[in-house]
Structures are given as structure tokens and as C-alpha cells.
Amino acid sequence: MALSRLSVLCGVREGRALFLRTPVVRPALVSAFLQGRPAQGWCGTQHIHLSPSHHSGSKAASLHWTGERVVSVLLLGLIPAAYLNPCSAMDYSLAATLTLHSHWGIGQVVTDYVHGDAVQKAAKTGLLVLSAFTFAGLCYFNYHDVGICKAVAMLWKL
């Protein structure tokens, strides 16, 4: 029953789906678009440049983006490792990576949504202070109390 409904939706006739016989985009248009020239029947006049600009961006921006991805992947492995082996090294690693990950994420929100030079500088300064206090607070909690891993385990036991 479900297959017959699916065949009606997909336009199956004689064992072949309708979308397999009907091209969505004509190859000539794609070829012309990639070569940067308009084709017959192409009404768009906007050009999209696929090659990277040598004038925009820098090596530092590329390294920053790579660093963000490394920290995100590191967190994916660090959280289960902290659950399986709670120790002070895991606590301090979590404190550093969570603070850095949060700092970069909220920094992007500030960059995207806070407008005006003075306001944006003040927001970024406030974020830097907040991140420093967050890291210091987590380190203080790790040193003087049970630590992040054991605190989460205690919350789960409630």
C-alpha cells in the first residue's frame, strides 16, 4: 500500500521513476555558468566567482577557523573520555576547551549582531572579561571542590 502511494508521488511508470527521465537542470546551462558566460535561455546576469579572492582573508583567519574546528572535535572526544576517566587532567582540559569554545561562539554572535565600532569593542571586551572569569572560576572549582567531572556525576545521581 505504501509503495503504491510512493509510486504515485514519484510518478513511477513502467518501473522507472519520473525524476530519472526528466533532467532538472540542462547540462548546457551548468557548463555555461561554470565558464562564466551566459547561455541561451539563461536570464540571470549575476556572476558568482568560485575561485578564492587573494585580497580577502588571511592566513590568521584560516588558522582561527581550523582552530575552532579542532576544539569542537576535541570536545567530541573529551566529553566521553571525562565520563569514562574522571580526573583532574580531564577537569582542567574541559575547563579550557569549554571556555575557548564558548568564547569563540559568543564572539561570532557579537560580530554578527552588535553594530557600531564603540559598542562592538565594548561587547568584545566584556566577552573577554567574562571568558577570563569563566575559566578562572572553573579552575577554582576544579582545585578547591570536586571538579567538573565529579560534579556532573553528582548531578546525575540526583
UniProtKB/Swiss-Prot annotation:
Database matches in Gene3D superfamilies: Fumarate reductase/succinate dehydrogenase, transmembrane subunit
Annotated metabolic or biological route of this protein: Carbohydrate metabolism; tricarboxylic acid cycle
Gene Ontology molecular function: heme binding; metal ion binding; ubiquinone binding
Residues annotated to bind a ubiquinone: 113
Chain ranges on the Mitochondrial intermembrane side, renumbered to this chain: 85-89, 142-158
Topology with respect to the bilayer: Multi-pass membrane protein
Similarity comment: family membership: Belongs to the CybS family.
Protein name: Succinate dehydrogenase [ubiquinone] cytochrome b small subunit, mitochondrial
Organism: Ovis aries (Sheep)
Primary gene name: SDHD
